[in-house]
Curated annotation (Swiss-Prot):
Organism expressing this protein natively: Methylibium petroleiphilum (strain ATCC BAA-1232 / LMG 22953 / PM1)
Listed name of the protein: Phosphoglucosamine mutase
Alphabetized InterPro entries for the sequence: A-D-PHexomutase_a/b/a-I (IPR005844), A-D-PHexomutase_a/b/a-I/II/III (IPR016055), A-D-PHexomutase_a/b/a-II (IPR005845), A-D-PHexomutase_a/b/a-III (IPR005846), A-D-PHexomutase_C (IPR005843), A-D-PHexomutase_C_sf (IPR036900), A-D-PHexomutase_CS (IPR016066), Alpha-D-phosphohexomutase_SF (IPR005841)
Upper classification of the organism: Bacteria, Pseudomonadati, Pseudomonadota, Betaproteobacteria, Burkholderiales
Catalytic reaction annotation: alpha-D-glucosamine 1-phosphate = D-glucosamine 6-phosphate
Catalytic site positions: S106 (phosphoserine intermediate)
Enzyme class, UniProt record, top EC level: isomerase
CDD domains referenced in this protein's UniProt entry, alphabetically: GlmM
EC number: 5.4.2.10
One GO location term (cellular component): cytosol
Length: 457
């Protein structure tokens, strides 16, 4: 069953255009509240939801609309103010709440916003739940009596609680003293908590992208604009740089030389660190500590091959961290992620967390006594070209004869030296054309051929 409003990461769009309007968001809050109450085992109890947001100026408006919608359905609300998405997931679980809600459009510019939800366990909710919400949104509202209206209040020290949680995901004796770090908060949800986490663990911290004004989230800073981080690391002669996106659920990492490390490399490093912590080589055949790793259709082939060489199973999920999580839960595995920097370590958190992931990487560096580059010496990624082609309204790229022909030509040219992946974005009107090959020029040539075919269609 298709969904009208929900994409791969909640509901997202331009502010002021359906569905990111105050009236729809109020209806959405009301519908979600009704769904929550219908699932209660005890009708006498009242659900409580947690609402967090990033730093977009539209967050104030949408927060108020959601709050009103929930209250009108008889649901209580706790408000955190600006807080990373994984912080909302953590607090929802830690405080035994009914639902977590995040108002954010992640890495998108400030003119966009979105809403996503977490279960009481701090996990992203399945498609079936979203379909139930969409059906309820279309029904007539069922306002509760005044005596049954929900209440709203601010949650004290939400940021401090999350900071302590992040620190708890690494060994108690871990110290980052002696490390100079540049931390880029993307002018987003982590602008206060990110520098604090690393500072409290002993690092010298230089903050950039930590001065939000409501209009500058992701603007020239953050995980989608790592050039700012590279420049700052080199200017300050820092050891490493850490860039988060607007809601801090993913990261980019830079070393002292300015080299960028993507999510594929960091996922492999996290796997190596856990393998190194296994009690003996006798455990290698079963890999009790790391039986398998989940990537996506976009994960670099070199990672799959390197894991196989170490006896670690690898499975590809659909693109999107929610699908990585579903695969991990189904298999009982712990580690998964995407090249974009969404990394999941279920032994640490229930969802992807840029700060927690960065701490896992730094912990591996500190306790090994080696640099990040040295730890990854055995991994050489295949050249991968990703082109984003904007689709016109109503454009049916699947029916394009020109694209089909360009794809046939590219497959013939690649042979067994590479692979092709063409897929639409789940959040924007874009077609993503990815080619991975043993030769960079070959990958670029094939990707450009197919992208040009889409533009001509």
């Amino acid at each position: 069953m298709s969904r009208t409003y929900f994409g791969t990461d909640g509901i997202r769009g331009a502010v002021g255009q359906a569905p990111i309007t105050p009236d729809f968001v109020l209806r959405l809050g009301h519908a979600v509240g009704r769904v929550l109450k219908s699932q209660q085992t005890s009708p006498a109890s009242r659900p409580t939801v947690l609402i967090g947001k990033d730093t977009r100026i539209s967050g104030y408006m949408l927060e108020s609309a959601l709050e009103a919608g929930f209250a009108s359905a008889g649901v209580d609300v706790l408000l955190t103010g600006p807080l990373p998405t994984p912080g909302v997931a953590y607090l929802t679980r830690a405080l035994r709440l009914s639902l977590g809600v995040v108002i954010s459009a992640s890495h998108n510019p400030y003119g966009d916003n979105g809403i996503k939800f977490f279960s009481a366990k701090g996990e992203k909710l399945p498609d079936s739940w979203e379909q139930q919400v969409e059906a309820t949104v279309e029904e007539a509202a069922q306002w509760v009596d005044s005596s049954g209206l929900g209440k709203a209040r601010r949650l004290d020290d939400a940021q401090g609680r999350y900071i302590e949680f992040c620190k708890s995901t690494v060994a108690g004796e871990l110290s980052l003293k002696g490390l100079k770090l540049v931390v880029d908060g993307a002018h987003g949800a982590a602008y206060q908590v990110a520098p604090a986490v690393f500072h409290e663990l002993g690092a010298e911290v230089i903050s950039i992208g930590c001065n939000p004004n409501g209009l500058n989230i992701n603007d020239g800073f953050g995980a989608t604009h790592p050039e700012a981080l590279v420049s700052a690391v080199q200017a300050h002669q820092a050891d490493y740089g850490i860039a988060l996106d607007g809601d801090a659920d993913r990261l980019q990492l830079v070393d002292a030389t300015g080299r960028l490390y993507n999510g594929d490399e960091l996922l492999y490093l996290m796997t190596l660190d856990r393998l190194a912590a296994e009690p003996s080589e006798d455990a290698a055949p079963s890999r009790v500590g790391v039986p398998g790793v989940v990537g996506t259709l976009m994960t670099n082939l070199a990672v799959e091959q390197a894991l196989a060489a170490r006896g670690v199973a690898f499975v590809r999920a659909k693109v999107g961290d929610r699908y990585v999580l579903e695969e991990l839960l189904a298999r009982g595995w712990q580690l998964g992620g995407e090249g974009s920097g969404h990394l999941i370590a279920l032994d640490k958190h229930t969802t992807g967390d840029g700060l927690v992931s960065a701490l896992q990487v730094l912990q591996a560096v500190v306790r090994s006594g080696r640099t990040l580059a040295q730890l990854l010496e055995g991994l050489t990624l295949f050249p991968q070209v990703l082109l984003n082609v904007r689709l016109q309204p109503g454009q049916d790229w699947k029916a394009s004869a020109a694209l089909a022909e360009a794809q046939r030509e590219s497959l013939a040219e690649l042979g067994e030296r590479g692979r092709i992946l063409i897929r639409p974005s789940g959040t924007e009107p874009l077609l993503r054309v990815m080619v991975e090959a043993s030769d960079a020029a070959l990958a670029q040539r094939c990707a450009q051929r197919m992208a040009d075919a889409v533009r001509r269609a």
